[in-house]
Swiss-Prot record:
Gene name of the encoded protein: yiaM
Native source species: Escherichia coli (strain K12)
Cytoplasmic-facing ranges: 1-6, 67-78, 136-157
Entry's transmembrane regions: 7-29, 44-66, 79-98, 113-135
Family from the record: Belongs to the TRAP transporter small permease family.
Cell location: Cell inner membrane
Subunit structure and binding partners: The complex comprises the extracytoplasmic solute receptor protein YiaO, and the two transmembrane proteins YiaM and YiaN.
Periplasmic face of the membrane: 30-43, 99-112
Membrane topology, record value: Multi-pass membrane protein
InterPro entries: DctQ, TRAP_DctQ
Protein name in UniProt: 2,3-diketo-L-gulonate TRAP transporter small permease protein YiaM
Phylogenetic placement of the source organism: Bacteria, Pseudomonadati, Pseudomonadota, Gammaproteobacteria, Enterobacterales
Keywords: Cell inner membrane, Cell membrane, Membrane, Transmembrane, Transmembrane helix, Transport
Biological process according to GO: C4-dicarboxylate transport; carbohydrate transmembrane transport; cellular response to salt; regulation of single-species biofilm formation
Length: 157
């Protein structure tokens, strides 16, 4: 799954870079531009960000503040990990719910140039929150079933 997401990110970034570069050349070199590039780049950037968040989560690359947790005993580290993963799971659920509502609400509104549904931008949040929630459920399961687990399992493992 990670390789597929990385390939999607690479294609997205390549398309985004090319269309913006071409539009810059056209705008400053020939005093014209492709109007749809601005809208398309917004959509691509939003999806790039949310798919990138999934890959970063799988790589355990998100910012973590661990200096306090590392000073705790293994039993307390496990308790804090349970609370942390539970909170992340709750936030993913809230994010998925809100993204679904906003996507449905704005699906009938269309962008002025491309005519794409505005809800398509909000829809990018849904797969991100669901995939991260899946990993969090797995982490919670591993923490609960491992009686001698000292620390939280790796994020993307």
């Amino acid at each position: 799954m990670k390789k597929i997401l990385e390939a999607i990110l690479a294609i997205n970034l390549a398309v985004l870079s090319c269309i913006v570069f071409i539009n810059i050349i056209l705008r400053y070199g020939f005093q014209t531009s492709i109007l749809s590039v601005d809208e398309l780049s917004r959509y691509l950037f939003v999806w790039l960000t949310f798919i990138g968040a999934i890959v970063a989560f799988m790589d355990n690359a998100h910012v973590q503040v661990t200096f306090l947790v590392e000073k705790l005993s293994p039993a307390w580290q496990r308790r804090v990990a349970l609370v942390t993963h539970s909170l992340i799971l709750f936030i993913c659920g809230a994010l998925a719910w809100g993204a679904t509502l906003k996507t449905i609400q704005d699906w009938s509104d269309y962008s002025p140039i491309l005519g794409l549904p505005i809800g398509l931008m909000y829809a990018a949040c849904l797969p991100t929150s669901l995939v991260i929630a899946f990993f969090e459920l797995r982490h919670l399961y591993q923490l609960i079933t491992r009686s001698n687990s000292l620390t939280s399992p790796p994020q993307g493992a």
